[in-house]
UniProtKB/Swiss-Prot annotation:
Fe cation binds at residue 305. Transmembrane segments: none annotated. This is Probable inactive purple acid phosphatase 29. Binds 1 Fe cation per subunit. One of its GO terms (cellular component) is extracellular region. Residues 1-34 form the signal peptide. Homodimer.
Length: 389
């Protein structure tokens, strides 16, 4: 009984926090341009990213949980998702929060605007920069995909973009953009991007006749990615403090590439595969585009909630985030989870921070202790070729 009272108190506190945050949002809207900030590595030479995949948020306390234990059903709702997010943000203190689609479950949503605001409320309250891309369910309420992104980019503390201005006239989808992570303050690379993040809209469902299934990353998006990657390489190699090679990158989108089908329980490096991969219905060649450019070291997706593995194919890590939300389907007794990525810088001989040294990841479970599992190194610049001159 005491546990239930504590749980209800926490629910009430979070409901008040969400209400207060939304009230402030309505009374004091912050223009998106005013929120833009330069992201950079910390004085400790680290940049941490929290991935939240498949919240499937609907109507708050009135929304029932899916696939939980019988003992959890009576007191389980969207608020469990809210509580989990607040806990993991407090525990990890990330530098950036990334929502990789199906943020709301449109079919069950009564008020799209209210559900979107509530879904992101813990991130907004944390005042940590955050970004979002769309999945295949975000637009299934009263908002179109464009309307969803148009609203998201106006929320406080977000760095999300509808599309890059230079590509808005030709690019497919809504939510394609790049963020640059600059070197540590007071280092020679403080004004140079040493880590590049790519966010892409993988769409929802195929609109091509006789090609039913999930959507895919289009040629126009790949063209934008290729141009952006090449431009960032030129900037990385340029004076002042020119660097060799290309800065490493990470890519985030919702629907898995067909190449995720290459893995099973035997060759996935960490994590589990508990369901089939619901990949894009056609192979548009984006994996090949990523390999050809060479900067992206890891891809992170959602969509298949009870898969949370990473697998390496041709030097590129393909990783699931694992299902986060309680209104999303899951597996009873298999905890909801979030993926954390930490990128570390190389320390130079004089004690200053240099370019990226390694990329690591682990997952946090929504259990009593927020257990950490499946720690692994995704990429290590062992050759130390990215040197500060």
């Amino acid at each position: 009984m005491a546990d239930n009272r504590r749980r209800r108190s926490l629910f009430d506190f979070l409901l008040f926090s969400v209400f207060l945050g939304l009230a402030c949002l309505c009374l004091s809207p912050i223009p998106a341009t005013a929120q833009r900030r330069k992201l950079r590595f910390s004085v400790n030479g680290e940049f941490k990213i929290l991935q939240v995949a498949d919240m499937h948020f609907a109507n708050g306390a009135k929304t029932q949980c899916q696939n939980v234990l019988p003992s959890q059903r009576a007191h389980c709702s969207d608020l469990n998702t809210t509580i989990f997010m607040s806990r993991v943000i407090a525990a990890e203190k990330p530098d950036l929060i990334v929502f990789t689609g199906d943020n709301i479950f449109g079919f069950d949503v009564k008020d799209a605007l209210k559900s979107i605001n509530a879904a992101f409320a813990p991130a907004i309250a944390s005042k940590i920069p955050w970004v979002a891309i769309l999945g295949n369910h975000d637009q299934e309420s009263t908002f179109t995909r464009q309307q969803v992104m148009n609203h998201i980019v106006k929320l406080p503390n977000t760095l999300s973009q509808v599309n890059p201005p230079e590509a808005a006239h030709y690019i497919d989808g809504f939510g394609n953009y790049n963020l640059q992570i600059h070197g540590a303050a007071d280092s020679k690379l403080q004004n140079k991007s040493v880590l590049n993040l790519y966010f892409l809209d993988s769409g929802d469902y195929s609109s091509v006749p006789y090609m039913e299934g999930y959507d895919w990353i289009k040629t126009s998006q790949q063209f934008w990615f290729d141009r952006t990657s090449k431009r960032l390489k030129r900037e990385y190699n340029a004076k002042p403090n020119p660097q060799e090679g290309i800065a490493p990158g990470l890519a985030y989108f919702h629907i898995p590439l067909p190449e995720f089908l290459s893995f099973d329980s035997k060759n996935a490096t960490k994590g589990v595969r508990q369901e089939g991969t619901s990949a894009a219905s056609t192979n548009s060649g984006f994996f090949t585009t990523l390999i050809a450019r060479g900067d992206v070291k890891s891809v992170f997706v959602g969509h298949d909630h009870v898969n949370d593995f990473c697998g390496e194919l041709k030097g590129l890590n393909l990783c699931y985030g694992g299902g986060f939300g309680y209104h999303a389907y899951g597996k009873a007794g298999w905890e909801r989870r979030a993926r954390v990525v930490v990128v570390d810088l190389n320390k130079k001989r004089k004690g200053k921070w240099g370019a990226v040294k390694s990329i690591k990841t682990w997952k946090r479970l929504d259990d009593k202790h927020l257990s950490v599992i499946d720690s692994q190194v995704l990429w290590n610049n062992s050759a130390n070729k990215l040197v500060v001159r």
